[in-house]
From Swiss-Prot:
Top-rank taxon: Bacteria
Function text: Binds 16S rRNA, required for the assembly of 30S particles and may also be responsible for determining the conformation of the 16S rRNA at the A site.
Record NCBIfam families: PRK08881.1
Single annotated GO MF: rRNA binding
An individual GO BP term: translation
InterPro entries: Ribosomal_uS14 (IPR001209), Ribosomal_uS14_bac/plastid (IPR023036), Ribosomal_uS14_sf (IPR043140)
UniProt family annotation: Belongs to the universal ribosomal protein uS14 family.
Protein name: Small ribosomal subunit protein uS14A
The species this protein was found in: Lactococcus lactis subsp. lactis (strain IL1403) (Streptococcus lactis)
Protein's gene: rpsN
Length: 89
């Protein structure tokens, strides 16, 4: 489980990215780099480290499912992820 402060920071960062997304695109089209530079640092999506939706774990994140491999494995074994089943060969 990640620290509560890290999860809160991630949520705040998501809001900032969404808030400045359109403005950032307009400024890029206009090639107004001075105005882009004045935007908040955390409003750029590249600075965001994706986290597990369940417990906030930052490593081994699986984009397709929005969770880390640890929680993916646990939920897949319990049969709680639709369309995922254990394979054997």
């Amino acid at each position: 489980m990640a620290k509560k402060s890290k999860i809160a920071k991630f949520k705040k960062q998501q809001k900032l990215v969404a808030q400045y997304q359109e403005l950032r695109q307009e400024l890029k089209k206009e090639k107004n780099y001075e105005a882009l530079r004045k935007l908040p640092k955390d409003s750029h999506p590249n600075r965001m480290k994706m986290r597990d939706r369940i417990d906030g774990r930052p490593r081994a994140y699986m984009r397709k499912f929005g969770m880390s491999r640890v929680n993916f494995r646990k939920l897949a074994h319990e049969g709680k992820i639709p369309g995922v089943k254990k394979s054997s060969w």
